[in-house]
């Protein structure tokens, strides 16, 4: 798998309010509990003083004083909630997680709404607090995954309040962003743990409930590519979907997608990946799931096509257009053919080269009757300039200038490009077989096209 580093503090979860299940404010809960009066007036006043303090550092001192003076207070749950909000304000995220875990350890003593709110806060700040190099990094990720999965499960099962004016369908719809949030968090932890099947499942859940979540699609793509064996095409689709939705660092992800496709296909013409990526991003904008009919050929697929191709099948496959032409071109762009025979239809001298317009066909009779070229064969008559096509341009052949219209030609070369209509296959890095080049004395005496060797 090609690795792309992604920062745990770079792409973060968007803040989310679980508006469908509002938890009671800390003050309201404490005031409601006054009817039970299980705490003293000094405890209550100390708590209210801490709650009313607007300076976070001063509030923290008041909370610490409260815990020192009243370590067994029945208000401790509300104190812990204030600790969580205060440490969040101070951006001390490890402490937020510490107090969230303390509250979650209370189990059934927490009402469901408060538990969900605490899970949400814990999950939301985790990417800020997580240190991948910490000795307990694996344990941190496991706890984060478990908290996120619990949050998704609790929210999915949370019943509609009796006084809600929403229909069941509306209430279920309102919960979807929250469930997606928790699923995305679980997927993030699974991805870091390299549990790719679990990450795929989590991110698919997240994107099903929030189809516009570009970050989850990005991470789903990484999960597919990290699986064993890699689910490459699904991974490419998910990455393209994330780019279409405007994921942060889209240009970098697009470059990564291009490189990943090149590694997967190993084509000889790297520039073809640019067109593929553009097309893929456009298509992925129409659907979160890859259509069963869409595919990207692997290197093995392209090698199979190339191995079964002849110059005649290249003509028919490329001229036919459609998916067959795309596949054939991916397989054969830049391919070298050792022996191609045809008849020269026209000679076009250039600056240091000659372009032979050539026809190749299935039979000698077809070749001799041809009047229209289906190949453009470029042969250098002087040393090719720096930057000429091909990594190892063919040596100059000045003697090819003696070849004329209607002469037969036999050459080896590399397919460079093609025009679909009228069809014309362009060749470069060409070497004409010396045996078909007439001697000076024989120039103008036409020879029929030689048989392919």
Model feature map: region roles:
Residues 103-105, 139-156, 225-251, 258-262, ...:
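TPR/TPR-like (Sel1-like) alpha-helical repeat modules
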Residues 69-77, 105-115, 154-177, 206-213, ...:
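Short solvent-exposed coil/turn linkers within tandem alpha-helical repeat scaffolds
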Residues 53, 90, 129-134, 138, ...:
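Structural motif corresponding to the intra-repeat A-B loop/turn of tetratricopeptide repeats
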Residues 155-163, 257-325, 431-453:
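Pro/Ala/Gly-rich low-complexity, hydrophilic intrinsically disordered segments
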Residues 25-82:
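N-terminal leader/linker segments that initiate helical-solenoid repeat arrays
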Residues 305-308, 312, 326, 345-453:
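OB-fold single-stranded nucleic acid-binding module
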